[in-house]
């Protein structure tokens, strides 16, 4: 047991690590194109940070948080998501708004491990604070679509979107939704029965098959939009159409957290079944004020890196090395100096010291080297090196004095 990873965690090695870093690099680059600034919060916060923001009706609060008491008796929680911590950061640091923040890192939830879902997972997270205009929603959804295009998976993913309306809309909707579900209270799942008194909208998010039958005939929130809510949502749909981003209005989409209002959306792929969201987010205009900050309209979304890793066809094995093959003691000693020079000039260098030349060249090939630099006492005396292009098999003698230029000319690196 001691030599196994904890259930729901995963080691990242070799190809998986390169795929992981590739996703982060693209997210960093795209975030800059849209004017997002980097922000990083600790992986744990005071538990109160999440209790205040996520709502006592959420699965995260009730079932999934990793919470413990530190030696000072303070209740601490490993972050289960980013938004609560970013809101804490915004309020504590008194950041000037409007502002766009991008963050990435690990998060933790105690849930059943499955394809693309771990108990320790990594997210890319985008938040926009201080913009009430629906154009912020359109731009953020466009950014998410841009990322999927960069990952070359946009054709396999569909955008589902809904509006929860403003607080007046939600209040009117609850007045009809609660009586509807109460008629079927004994037939609802245990989770949905608990949600009926805490946050009945969350029942619409149930994946239970019996619940789905009841939900299918539930009243639609769109019938209770205020004029302002309806206009806001229509502007978003029109904006997405103008950007050629297809979407499907899903009137049952509410998202899993209690703080959302107006826009909620998910980019969904069937490969992950009932838990098929690759990116998900929405608007939360009242969240900052609920934790003691000023009223700050906001919208954000997050995506799980492990999920994206399951979908992309990225097989880069990192930079291909240049392999040094010294022959003889003097050449072996010189190889250290040569390797240092090449690395200082930005080249990835490995050594092959042991065995016959044929075996060492075989190992260089197995290491996917793009070239081998072969040298012994004779080459050291004439200040030359033999370079072999491992792809073409071509060999040539190059001058040591101009080594970087000669390597570039030979390999076009």
UniProtKB/Swiss-Prot annotation:
Keyword hit for Transport: no
Gene3D superfamilies in UniProt: Anticodon-binding domain, Bira Bifunctional Protein, Domain 2
CDD domains: HisRS-like_core
GO biological process terms, semicolon-separated: histidyl-tRNA aminoacylation
A single MF term (Gene Ontology): histidine-tRNA ligase activity
Catalyses which reaction(s): tRNA(His) + L-histidine + ATP = L-histidyl-tRNA(His) + AMP + diphosphate + H(+)
EC number: 6.1.1.21
One GO location term (cellular component): cytoplasm
Uppermost EC category: ligase
Compartment(s): Cytoplasm
This protein's UniProt keywords: Aminoacyl-tRNA synthetase, ATP-binding, Cytoplasm, Ligase, Nucleotide-binding, Protein biosynthesis
PANTHER family noted in UniProt: HISTIDINE--TRNA LIGASE, MITOCHONDRIAL-RELATED, HISTIDYL-TRNA SYNTHETASE
HAMAP family from the UniProt entry: His_tRNA_synth
Assembly notes: Homodimer.
Entry's family note: Belongs to the class-II aminoacyl-tRNA synthetase family.
Protein name, entry field: Histidine--tRNA ligase
């Amino acid at each position: 047991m001691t030599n196994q990873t904890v259930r729901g965690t995963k080691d990242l090695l070799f190809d998986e690590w390169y795929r992981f870093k590739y996703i982060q690099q693209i997210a960093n680059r795209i975030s800059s194109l849209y004017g997002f600034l980097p922000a990083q919060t600790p992986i744990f916060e005071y538990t109160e940070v999440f209790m205040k923001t996520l709502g006592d009706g959420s699965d995260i609060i009730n079932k999934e948080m990793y919470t413990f008491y530190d030696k000072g008796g303070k209740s601490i929680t490993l972050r289960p998501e980013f938004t609560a911590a970013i809101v804490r950061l915004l309020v504590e640091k008194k950041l000037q708004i409007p502002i766009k923040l991008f963050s990435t890192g690990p998060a933790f939830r105690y849930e059943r491990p499955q394809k693309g879902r771990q108990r320790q997972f990594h997210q890319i997270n985008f938040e926009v604070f201080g913009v009430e205009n629906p154009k912020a929603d359109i731009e953020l959804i466009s950014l998410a679509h841009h990322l999927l295009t960069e990952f070359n998976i946009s054709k396999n993913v569909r955008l589902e979107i809904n509006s929860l309306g403003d607080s007046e809309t939600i209040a009117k909707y609850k007045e009809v939704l609660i009586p509807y579900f109460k008629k079927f209270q004994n037939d609802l799942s245990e989770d949905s029965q608990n949600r009926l008194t805490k946050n009945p909208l969350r029942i619409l998010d149930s994946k239970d098959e019996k619940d789905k039958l009841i939900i299918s005939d539930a009243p639609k929130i769109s019938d209770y939009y205020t004029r302002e809510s309806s206009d806001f949502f229509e502007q978003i749909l029109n904006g997405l159409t103008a950007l050629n981003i297809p979407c499907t209005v899903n009137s049952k989409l509410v998202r899993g957290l209690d703080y959302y209002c107006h826009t909620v959306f998910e980019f969904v792929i069937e490969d992950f079944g009932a838990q098929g969201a690759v990116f998900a987010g929405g608007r939360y205009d009242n969240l900052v004020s609920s934790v003691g900050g000023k009223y700050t309209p906001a919208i954000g979304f997050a995506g799980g890196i492990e999920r994206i890793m399951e979908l992309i066809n990225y097989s880069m094995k990192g930079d291909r090395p240049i392999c040094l093959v010294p022959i003889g003691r003097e050449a072996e000693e010189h190889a250290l100096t040569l390797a240092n020079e090449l690395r200082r000039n930005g080249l990835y260098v490995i050594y092959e010291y042991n065995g016959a030349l044929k075996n060492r060249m075989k190992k260089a090939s197995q290491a996917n080297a793009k070239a081998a630099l072969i040298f012994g006492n004779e080459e050291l005396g004439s200040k030359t090196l033999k370079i072999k292009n491992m792809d073409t098999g071509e060999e040539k003698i190059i001058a040591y004095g101009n080594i970087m230029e000669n390597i570039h000319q030979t390999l076009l690196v």
